[in-house]
Amino acid sequence: MPFWQKAEANFMPDKVFHYSKFLIAVILVGLVAALAIDVERHHVETANTRVDMAIDYEGLQELAQREGLPEDEVLAQAKDAGITSLAVYETTFKKLNENGKATAIAGARLLESYHDGTLTDPAWRSLVEQGKIVGTEAYVTGHDAQTYKEVKEDLIRRLGADRVTVLQAGSQEVLAVKAHYESLMKMNLGMPTDEMKKVNDAGFYVLARPSNYLKCTDDDVKAVFARLDGFKISEIVFSGNQTLGAPGALMATIDEMKHRNLTLGLIEATTQLQFYKQDGMEEIAKNLGYDRVARLYSIPKDEQPKLKIDTAVERWANTDMERNIRIDLLRIYDKPSPNMTLLETNMKYFRDTHDALAQHGFTIGPSDTFASFYPSKWLRGILMLGVAAAGVLYLSLVIPRLNASRKWQVILFVVFGLLAAVPVFMGAGSKIRVLAALASANVFPSLAVIGLLDYVRTKRDELAKHLIPLMVTAVIALFVTGALSYIGAAYLSGALADTEYLLEFQIFRGIKLTFVLPMVLVGIAFLQRFDIFDGRMDDTDGVIEQLKKILDMPVRIKTLIGLAFVGLAAIVFVARSGHTSGMPVSQTELHFRAMLEQAFYARPRTKELLIGHPAFMLAMMAFARKWPTMLLFALVLVATIGQGSMVETFAHMRTPIYMSFLRGIGGIVLGAGIGAVCMVLIELWQFVLAKAKAAAAKK
């Protein structure tokens, strides 16, 4: 039987579900509260638009050396190209040996030079002869007074005074250091004031990158910040896997940063989710205030050489727009582009990045931070009541006895409402908020689809059968259902929105569940309303009886193969969803995504425009033309993917709410277009088959 052949008895007309006006009213009141929170969130997000374009000072030094140019000339060009901050790291003996401001030499090498006659300085020969040169120690001399003073101070802090001894080589002071020479060469030796001065003098801010001390004390912390005094600092981003002061002197770090009103930069993790873990970072952020925290991203060192400049520039624009990154730590390209010098290549990269950010509404300078944003507990509590009402409304639409009893609906609402709202009204309820967000992401898109099913059941005979009117009806239905699903998006955002979620100190849990659960919820409701066996079930039968019949059905090998493919598709669908993907994305899809990013302010999600929304259009066609209900069931479940995805987009709280909103709209518009094309193709297919069948009948 062709799939478009009419199935006259594919729904259960006696099963009429009533929608509680009381519960709907509570949902609407909760929606007002949710929208109030969301509008406030939007204002907070639009006020945070300044991005710090930074690069390592060492990177520009390397670029100058590679091109054989004066450092000042390269710095000036970088400034003109849009760079605002230079990252300055702690100095090391490796760097000091190269710039000649201080030298560390192994005692074994001095002894070797003494014995082979190449150590000619009388003062040093005297130290050897006095037995003051030990082969297992290192000896430090300075050639710049300020640098030597800072190195001496930091060596004593890091190693202790008992491991650093002052010697005299004639009129020159020498430090004898009890340390493994190779380790000493790599040891951090404090923030170099000469580099910070040069950075400021060239017109840049300093992005300070201090590291922690072993058994760090309050005095160590104060010494680090004292060295930063007098310099223009844009942000502090700690180096290594510990913040300065961890674990015992964190309050000193917090106090020093508060005193100087400094911004803490935290490095986004390589998974592009939350942060690179540094001991003490959460305590500093919490006590400093989340309104003094900015997110930093840097394209991985091994990835950047594979990216063309325009691709990298697009990466920066998308990163800052979609993930609330406000410190862009760039790297230099170490190979020139065709027909360009290495300097020209990098200046083009900097300039194009600056221009792309400006085109997207960003200003360039020391990073902005989010204002302290914690919505009213009263608004949030009212929102929670709306979520409770939505949960009860769903239950009433799948449990006939509950649907018939207004009393039990109210009782359930009171119970759920108290459990959800009371902790929030008391100023707590962080876990309840997550559960409310999870419920919003699953229940509201399900209610939207169920509401459509109930509406079209009553209008089945009135639905247009001809293609163009049917297509228009399907598009209108898609937009209306999408608008209803967006109620869930408003609730989800309102339940979670605060500064900690915008910065990703907290994240929504249950992303992968939201791709599956709405289909389950809609599937249950569908089986309560429709006989998927087209008249072979009693009208009084519902979900359980239909599931039993499905389980009792004999299974053929081809059915098993088909189910295996469906299962594989489901695994791929879920694995590629969520904050982190368990499966790679093909190059073809990456190119398709890039095209969408160029065409739209916010790239629509492929699961909406290619899967969910076209299936929605076809489901309307299936219902109007009375295709087999089993096929309608499958299309409705797939259509639910699109509705759930629209809401789930808002679970990525780091993405601005306006961008998430436009992403969903773009998905509906494109998805409706693709769905319309699919409807036309099926219409043509049916026409061709009908012609062929008529021709065969004439023979």
Name each model feature, range by range:
Residues 2-63, 75, 84:
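Hydrophobic secretory-pathway targeting helix
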Residues 3-4, 10-33, 385-699:
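Alpha-helical transmembrane segments of integral membrane proteins
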Residues 18-21, 41, 50, 66, ...:
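Arginine residue identity/basic-tract feature
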Residues 327-412, 416-428, 433:
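Non-cytosolic juxtamembrane linkers/loops
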